[in-house]
Amino acid sequence: GKDIIMRAHVVSQKLNREQTKEYYTNTKIEFPVDYLDVLKDFTLNEPVDLYAPEFAYGAGIFSSRKDLMEEKLGTNQGILFQMGEAYKCYRSIEDFTPLTAEQKAVLEALPSPAYKQLLTVLNDKLLKKIELNKQKTGYKINEIGKVTNEELFSTIISKFRGHVLLVDFWATWCGPCRMANKAMIPMKEELKDEDILYLYITGETSPKGTWENMIPDIHGEHFRVTNDQWAYLMSTFKIGGVPTYFVIDAEGNTTFKQTGFPGTDTMKKQLMKALKK
């Protein structure tokens, strides 16, 4: 509905990042108060809905507007609401955040024990992974210290001057970022004897706990900047999304920049090109 209309308009007008941000901030599309009354005419809260592959995804989306769904459906009970609560717990685990006592109580209260059983298994696996992460090496969390926004990026890369750098602007919630990180593991192993360092920069939209539990599997130098610093980097370097990659040669020159993972072959080619300069 609303999102599709706005996205289509943004794409058709080919707006740049700043215009897009201003558009989404200032454009208000008013819908009639009864616009979503049609929801009560759909079968959204029956066990038969579980046969639809998209139902779990939809329940997850609806869980963020539980108040609206209660109003339109006239109830807060049923499979849709159960799945919504379970989905929120699942997303927590997916974000490397173990279930809280409150979340466990929510699962305990659900009519079907299946939710608790399945999510307890996933939660236990996560807890074991977190313990194993404490023993892992190959990654380092770096503190930036107090610097101006103008000095931020130069401060980050200065201690690594003289090496070829692959700088990855990413986020823990970014699926393509996470897939790319896994895809590059064999490449990094292949190039381990080359003079290449990997720098990962993320912002506060990556929850600190999630970030700390995710990076042990991402070998390299890690930085987590503030929202203000992140916004400055995005604006200064005209970064429109994540992941965005910079290849920087030993002299500090940016030899390659791309938003979106270009694939390991291209990445390796660009790194080797920078090494030979």
Mark where each language-model region is.
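Extracytoplasmic/secreted envelope proteins and their assembly/folding machinery
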Residues: 150, 154, 185-188, 208, ...
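Conserved helix-turn-beta segment immediately C-terminal to the redox Cys motif
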Residues: 163-164, 181-201, 269, 273-274
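Conserved segment of the thioredoxin-like fold in thiol-based oxidoreductases
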Residues: 189-230, 235, 239-242
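Conserved redox-active cysteine motifs that mediate thiol-disulfide chemistry
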Residues: 169-186
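Hydrophobic, well-ordered secondary-structure segments
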Residues: 136-139, 150-156, 163, 177, ...
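Oxidative protein folding and maturation machinery
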Residues: 1-161
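Thiol/disulfide oxidoreductase modules built on the thioredoxin-like
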Residues: 228-272
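Short pre-active-site segment immediately N-terminal to redox-active cysteine/selenocysteine motifs
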Residues: 163-165, 169-173, 241
